[in-house]
Amino acid sequence: MTVRTRIAPSPTGDPHVGTAYIALFNLCFARQHGGQFILRIEDTDRVRSTAESEQMILDSLRWLGLEWDEGPDVGGPHGPYRQSERGDIYAQYAQQLLDAGHAFKCYRTSEELDELREARKAAGLHLALKPADLALPDDEVARREREQWPYVVRMKVPGEGSCVVSDMLRGEIEVDWAQVDAQILLKSDGMPTYHLANVVDDHLMGITHVMRGEEWINSAPKHKLLYEYFDWPMPTLCHMPLLRNPDKSKLSKRKNPTSINYYRRMGFLPQAVTNYLGRMGWSMPDDREKFTLEEMMANFDIQRVSLGGPVFDLEKLTWLNGVYIREDLDDAALLQALREWAFNDAYVNQILPQVRPRISTLSDVMPLAGHFFSGVPPLEASSFDGIKLEHETLLKLLQFLTWRLEGVSRWEKDVLLDDVKALAEAFDMKMKAFLAPVFIAVTGSATSTSVLDAMAILGSDMTRARLRHAIEVLGGVSKKQAKRFEKEYRQLQV
């Protein structure tokens, strides 16, 4: 048997360090067993998926040195490798489940589903809806079908008992069927959900080992049941521990930068980032901290993965990156790294239009453009003394903008402008006044190049990191304030 593993990211935003972490372990496991590593794109979310995000994923993984044997850009015998191009395949297998009685069409409206869940909640039952809960009288089903109501295809699941799933790291995992819902397999637009698409794709692509984050453990019974319905052999499962913040909370872009693009923009070396990700819950047999990707692949043993919840510590990564710079880069290599980092034509050409109208001598460039070549600006609370806002309003403005930017999938100036305008109107402020503290937070100065252009060039994670830094410099948001801010933010009609 040839070992075949895969990574299947969704192109809905910046490439996440968690994606790179799971990809690294899949790659090392495959190479350790002389196998193949596949990259598949889960782009069934038609609203949020973008070609730009897909390209960023490919570029980021390659930057880290993670190469795949088959994928949307390199091809292979099991394509297409984008789920959006495999719709007919999923429809065929969904129909097979319907014909065999393992799935059913559900015409329930969202309002009816809410009522059913509320009824189960009031009765003290699991909120998972079963086929019996969703059933309609035959004549009502016939009427909705005749009137062409929208429907989804759901899988049938047992109402009682438990499902036992084997895991490479955790042994046998038992999940009560009572907490497993009649999962949607095909959405009303005909696109598959994760559950159907992944089972079908993993089988057709010959995936032998599914190594993914532990957040998918509760979905494993659905996948096992689908393999049984199709009468297919199930791949070996391995649920990896999730990356954690230093406070042990789940790694989240709300607390820390999570984009590979951020670390690349900050000037981290790809070999240092890959090395550090390799230390997430795993160690070399001799426990050394610094090792190459080739050394990790040669010594990889999945049983050495610890389930304790690896901590992604930025200070530790920064230390390791410094070791690489000092020990591995001579002057020529360091100069080349600087060019690749920021002093390259592609990046500088984005900045030149911002500074050209404002300079008289070449030495004027760095004071105007220094924020494009640095991490977070060296701010103090006094940096905001010229902002004529109450302290809490200032914190709220920066926090609301940070949250607003988390939802931006197309990071371009026109989109950012619309979002900032919407928030400025919600605060009943003119754009100039609203942007004044944002200028300082993002560029480190009250006067600089266009802050919206700067945000577009710096990227989403770097921009949000600078906004979070400004909030911290101003004393931070207390837990009490955070709760109030979140409530107010949800109530905003923007």
UniProtKB/Swiss-Prot annotation:
Cysteine-cysteine disulfides: none
- Give the UniProt keywords, A-Z: Aminoacyl-tRNA synthetase, ATP-binding, Cytoplasm, Ligase, Nucleotide-binding, Protein biosynthesis
Could you say which residues form the signal peptide? none
Q: Does the keyword RNA-binding apply?
A: no
Family indicated by similarity = Belongs to the class-I aminoacyl-tRNA synthetase family. Glutamate--tRNA ligase type 1 subfamily.
The task this protein performs is described as: Catalyzes the attachment of glutamate to tRNA(Glu) in a two-step reaction: glutamate is first activated by ATP to form Glu-AMP and then transferred to the acceptor end of tRNA(Glu).
Instruction: Write the protein's name.
Output: Glutamate--tRNA ligase
Q: State the species of origin.
A: Chromohalobacter salexigens (strain ATCC BAA-138 / DSM 3043 / CIP 106854 / NCIMB 13768 / 1H11)
Which gene name belongs to this protein?
A: gltX
